[in-house]
Curated annotation (Swiss-Prot):
One Gene Ontology term of the molecular function aspect: rRNA binding
UniProt keyword terms in alphabetical order: Ribonucleoprotein, Ribosomal protein, RNA-binding, rRNA-binding
Family stated for the protein in its record: Belongs to the universal ribosomal protein uL24 family.
Entry-linked Pfam families: KOW (PF00467), ribosomal_L24 (PF17136)
Organism: Clostridium acetobutylicum (strain ATCC 824 / DSM 792 / JCM 1419 / IAM 19013 / LMG 5710 / NBRC 13948 / NRRL B-527 / VKM B-1787 / 2291 / W)
Assembly behavior: Part of the 50S ribosomal subunit.
UniProt lineage: Bacteria, Bacillati, Bacillota, Clostridia, Eubacteriales
InterPro entries cross-referenced by the UniProt entry: KOW, Rib_uL2_dom2, Ribosomal_uL24, Ribosomal_uL24_KOW, Translation_prot_SH3-like_sf
Domain of life: Bacteria
Name of the protein: Large ribosomal subunit protein uL24
Disulfide bonds: none
Function: One of two assembly initiator proteins, it binds directly to the 5'-end of the 23S rRNA, where it nucleates assembly of the 50S subunit.
Length: 106
C-alpha cells in the first residue's frame, strides 16, 4: 500500500468511522507500509495468552489493534474538532502543519 500517512506519532486523532467512532486518542505507532496506525485505547481486542516463562500466569490480555489510517482525522485541541491540515513554510524555512479551521500549528 505504501501511501503517505497524514498523522504522526504522538498526534491527537479522532476516529471517524467504525465501532470506535468519535473516540479521541493519541497515536502510538504508524505503519506506512500497511497504511495503519495504533491509537491508545481505541480498537481494543482481547488476546488469549498462554502461560510461558516470562508470563507465568496466562489469561486474557487486552491490547490495541491497528486501525486503517483513512478512518482517523487529526484532532485540533484549540477548536476541539476533527480537522484537515494544510502545510505552510515559515519565514525561517521550517515546514509546519496548520489546522484548516482555526490556523493553529501542530
Amino acid at each position: 500500500m505504501a501511501n503517505k500517512i497524514h498523522v504522526r506519532k504522538q498526534d491527537s486523532v479522532v476516529v471517524i468511522s467504525g465501532k470506535d467512532r468519535g473516540k479521541i486518542g493519541e497515536v502510538l505507532a504508524v505503519n506506512p507500509k500497511k497504511g495503519t496506525v495504533l491509537i491508545k485505547d481505541v480498537n481494543v481486542v482481547v488476546k488469549h495468552q498462554k502461560a510461558n516463562k516470562e508470563n507465568m500466569q496466562g489469561g486474557l490480555i487486552k491490547k490495541e489493534a491497528p486501525i486503517n489510517s483513512a478512518k482517523v482525522m487529526l484532532y485540533c485541541t484549540k477548536c476541539k474538532t476533527a480537522t484537515r491540515i494544510s502545510k505552510k513554510v515559515l519565514d525561517d524555512g521550517t515546514k509546519v502543519r496548520v489546522c484548516k479551521k482555526c490556523g493553529e500549528t501542530f
